[in-house]
C-alpha cells in the first residue's frame, strides 16, 4: 500500500474499516469538468498528521450543536453544565465528581434527539424516563463516558428515589435540579425576573423532588451576583472557564474516533431515514481513500470527517429533512444551510481544521455549482472529493421519504451521470466502479452493524428501566 507521502503502509495498520480492500493501490490524477488535472499539493491534501484534539474542545462543540436542535434548547446544555459545577463546588464535592457532573450535564439531553417530536416534548416530556434512558445507552458506547452515562440515566429521577440508589442516582438528581432551574431561567425575557421565578419554584416544588441540601445550594447560586453575571454569559465564557477548571486533556486518535462515532450516531438518529447514513459515508470514504494511497493518519481524519459531515443537520427542522415531496424555493436554502453549519461547528474545534474542510465540503462540486462555498476544480481537496462521492453513493442506496433506495448498479449510473455533468471527480468514479463490490460491501456491512445498534436502542427504550419510573 502506498501512503500519501510515498511510504509503504502494512495492511495490519489499517484499523478503521471492518472490511479490508484488497488489490493494487491506485494513484489518482486530479480531474475536473474540463478534464485531467495534476494531483493537488500536500498543502491542499492537508499533510499527514495525527489527530490531537482536546477533550473539552470536542465536548463543548458538540454541546453547542445539541443546543441548536430546537430554539427551546438554545444554550441549555452549556448552562446546565455551568450550574452543576457551581452546585458541586458549594456542596464540597471532590474534583473528580465535579468533572464527571460537568461532562454529564453538558450532554444530559443527547437522548431527546431520536425521541423529539415538538418543543414541548423536548422540555416537558410526558414520559420523563425515556430520553434519559436513550441518552445513557448512547453514551455507554463511548468507554470514556461510561460513568457519565449512568448520571444521564438518572437525571430526571426525584431525590426521594435517588437518595438510596447509589452515587450515580444521587448525582443524576443533582442534574435534575440544574436542568429544571435552567428551564425556569429561560421562561421570561427579563433575566432578573426569571431568576426570581426560578428561586421561588425551587422551594415551591413538593417535598421529595429535590434534596434539601441541593435546594439550599441552588438558592445560594441564585442569590450570588457574581455567579448570576457569569450564568447570563455562560455560553460566551464557558470555554475559558472549562480550560481553567479542568485542564487540557488530549484525546488519542482512537478516542477521537470513538467520540466522533458516538456523535455521528446521535446525528443520524434524528430520522429513521438517515439512521445509519454517517456510518456508511465514513466507512466507504475510508475504503475509497485507502485505494488512493492515503496514509493511516489521513484515513483516521477522513473517518472522523465522515461521521461528522452532517452535524449541521441538527440545526435544520426535521420536517424539512423528512419532507416527502419536492422542496420549495424557500425551503431548499434552509436545508442547504446544514453544510454551512457543519463547517462552522467543526471549525470551532482546534485541531479539526481538516475535518471541517473535508467533511463540510461534501456538497462542493467540481464545476463550482456546489455549496456552501461554491469551490471549483483544484480548490476542492482530494479528501473532500472522496467524501462527496461516498455521500452521494450512500444516500442513493438508502430509503428516503420521497423514494426507495437504489440498487448499487443504479447508484453507480447516477454517479457516472454526475461526473459527466461536471459535479464529481471522474478518477474517483472509475475507482468506485472498478471496486464497486468491495466498496459497497464495506458500506452495507457497516450500516447493517449500525442498524443493529439502533434497533437495540429502540428495543431498550420500548422496555423502560423500572428504576426510572415514579
Specify the residue positions occupied by each region the protein language model found.
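Intrinsic, low-complexity polybasic segments
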Residues: 25, 34-36
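Periodic, rod-like helical contexts
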Residues: 12-13, 27
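Short, Lys/Arg-enriched N-terminal segments with co-localized hydrophobic residues
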Residues: 37-48
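Intrinsic disorder/low-complexity segments
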Residues: 16-18, 31-33
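Low-acidity, Ser/Thr- and Arg-rich intrinsically disordered low-complexity segments
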Residues: 1-8, 15-17
Amino acid at each position: 500500500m502506498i501512503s500519501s507521502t510515498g511510504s509503504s503502509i502494512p495492511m495490519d495498520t489499517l484499523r478503521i474499516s471492518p472490511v479490508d480492500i484488497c488489490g493494487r493501490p491506485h494513484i489518482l490524477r486530479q480531474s475536473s469538468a474540463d478534464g485531467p488535472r495534476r494531483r493537488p499539493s500536500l498543502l491542499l491534501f492537508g499533510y499527514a498528521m495525527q489527530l490531537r484534539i482536546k477533550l473539552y474542545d470536542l465536548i463543548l462543540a458538540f454541546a453547542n450543536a445539541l443546543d441548536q436542535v430546537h430554539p427551546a434548547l438554545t444554550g441549555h446544555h452549556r448552562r446546565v453544565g455551568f450550574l452543576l459545577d457551581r452546585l458541586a463546588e458549594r456542596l464540597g464535592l471532590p474534583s473528580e465528581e465535579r468533572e464527571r457532573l460537568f461532562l454529564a450535564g453538558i450532554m444530559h439531553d443527547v437522548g431527546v434527539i431520536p425521541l423529539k417530536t415538538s418543543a414541548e416534548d423536548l422540555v416537558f416530556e410526558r414520559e420523563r424516563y425515556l430520553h434519559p434512558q436513550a441518552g445513557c445507552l448512547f453514551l455507554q458506547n463511548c468507554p470514556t463516558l461510561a460513568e457519565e452515562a449512568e448520571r444521564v440515566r438518572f437525571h430526571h429521577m426525584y431525590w426521594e428515589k435517588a437518595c438510596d440508589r447509589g452515587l450515580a442516582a444521587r448525582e443524576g438528581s443533582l442534574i435534575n435540579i440544574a436542568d429544571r432551574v435552567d428551564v425556569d431561567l429561560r421562561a421570561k425575557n427579563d433575566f432578573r425576573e426569571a431568576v426570581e421565578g426560578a428561586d421561588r419554584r425551587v422551594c415551591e416544588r413538593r417535598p421529595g423532588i429535590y434534596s434539601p441540601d441541593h435546594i439550599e445550594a441552588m438558592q445560594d447560586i441564585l442569590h450570588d451576583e457574581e455567579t448570576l453575571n457569569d450564568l447570563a454569559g455562560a455560553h460566551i465564557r464557558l470555554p475559558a472557564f472549562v480550560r481553567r477548571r479542568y485542564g487540557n486533556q488530549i484525546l488519542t486518535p482512537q478516542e477521537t474516533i470513538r467520540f466522533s462515532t458516538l456523535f455521528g450516531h446521535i446525528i443520524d438518529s434524528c430520522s429513521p431515514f438517515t439512521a445509519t447514513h454517517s456510518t456508511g459515508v465514513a466507512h466507504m470514504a475510508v475504503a475509497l481513500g485507502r485505494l488512493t494511497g492515503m496514509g493511516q493518519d489521513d484515513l483516521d481524519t477522513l473517518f472522523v470527517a465522515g461521521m461528522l459531515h452532517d452535524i449541521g443537520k441538527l440545526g435544520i427542522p426535521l420536517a424539512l429533512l423528512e419532507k416527502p415531496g419536492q422542496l420549495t424555493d424557500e425551503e431548499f436554502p434552509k436545508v442547504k444551510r446544514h453544510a454551512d453549519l457543519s463547517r462552522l461547528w467543526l471549525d470551532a474545534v482546534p485541531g479539526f481544521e481538516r475535518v471541517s474542510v473535508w467533511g463540510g465540503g461534501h456538497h462542493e462540486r467540481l464545476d463550482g455549482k456546489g455549496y456552501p462555498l461554491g469551490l471549483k476544480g483544484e480548490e476542492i481537496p482530494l479528501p473532500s472529493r472522496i467524501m462527496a462521492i461516498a455521500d452521494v453513493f450512500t444516500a442513493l442506496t438508502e430509503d428516503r421519504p420521497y423514494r426507495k433506495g437504489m440498487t448499487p448498479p443504479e447508484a453507480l449510473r447516477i454517479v457516472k451521470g454526475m461526473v459527466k455533468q461536471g459535479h464529481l471527480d471522474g478518477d474517483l468514479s472509475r475507482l468506485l466502479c472498478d471496486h464497486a463490490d468491495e466498496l459497497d460491501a464495506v458500506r452495507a456491512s457497516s450500516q447493517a452493524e449500525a442498524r443493529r445498534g439502533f434497533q437495540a436502542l429502540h428495543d431498550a427504550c420500548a422496555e423502560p428501566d423500572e428504576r426510572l419510573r415514579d
